[in-house]
Amino acid sequence: MGRMHSSGKGISSSALPYSRNAPSWFKLSSDDVVEQIIKYARKGLTPSQIGVILRDAHGVSQAKVVTGNKILRILKSNGLAPEIPEDLYYLIKKAVSVRKHLEKNRKDKDSKFRLILIESRIHRLARYYRTVAVLPPNWKYESATASALVA
């Protein structure tokens, strides 16, 4: 799938392991991995950060292979899932930082244009999350209250 606001094709990607089973050298049980996920979520880490830590520190290539569930599903079942989806959260955070930059640098036309692109991405993603019922139907992005969402 190509990029939304540029001509890039986006063909670079990582290759998933062919085997859908845990490797033979992997010794942790699925309960241990779930406990680790819950522990890191309570520290305030996002699902992708938890996945990176599990991969680098504990040798878990994919949590779904070991536990049978994705990290976000495990967090939802334990009531630790973030209220705003992670990709939407980081887009809002980026828009807040660009808006803060524009307060100091009012003549920065390029940043003004990029802010419009970021906010259009936010609106499109929010519309998708409302249709799949991840966000409530009356949820709306407003630039005035956005800094409170990411703080």
From Swiss-Prot:
Protein name: Small ribosomal subunit protein uS15
Gene expressing this chain: RPS13
GO biological process terms on file: translation
Family: Belongs to the universal ribosomal protein uS15 family.
SUPFAM superfamilies: S15/NS1 RNA-binding domain
GO molecular function: small ribosomal subunit rRNA binding; structural constituent of ribosome
Summary of the function given for this chain in its UniProt record: Component of the ribosome, a large ribonucleoprotein complex responsible for the synthesis of proteins in the cell. The small ribosomal subunit (SSU) binds messenger RNAs (mRNAs) and translates the encoded message by selecting cognate aminoacyl-transfer RNA (tRNA) molecules. The large subunit (LSU) contains the ribosomal catalytic site termed the peptidyl transferase center (PTC), which catalyzes the formation of peptide bonds, thereby polymerizing the amino acids delivered by tRNAs into a polypeptide chain.
Subcellular location(s) per record: Cytoplasm
Matches recorded under Gene3D superfamilies: 4.10.860.130, S15/NS1, RNA-binding
Cellular component annotations (GO), alphabetically ordered: cytosolic small ribosomal subunit; hyphal cell wall; nucleolus
Record's subunit section: Component of the small ribosomal subunit. Mature ribosomes consist of a small (40S) and a large (60S) subunit. The 40S subunit contains about 32 different proteins and 1 molecule of RNA (18S). The 60S subunit contains 45 different proteins and 3 molecules of RNA (25S, 5.8S and 5S).
Keywords recorded for this protein, A-Z: Cytoplasm, Ribonucleoprotein, Ribosomal protein
Family annotation (InterPro entries): Ribosomal_uS15, Ribosomal_uS15_arc_euk, Ribosomal_uS15_N, uS15_NS1_RNA-bd_sf
Organism of derivation: Candida albicans (strain SC5314 / ATCC MYA-2876) (Yeast)
A Pfam short name: Ribosomal_S15
Cross-referenced NCBIfam families: PRK08561.1 (NF006331)
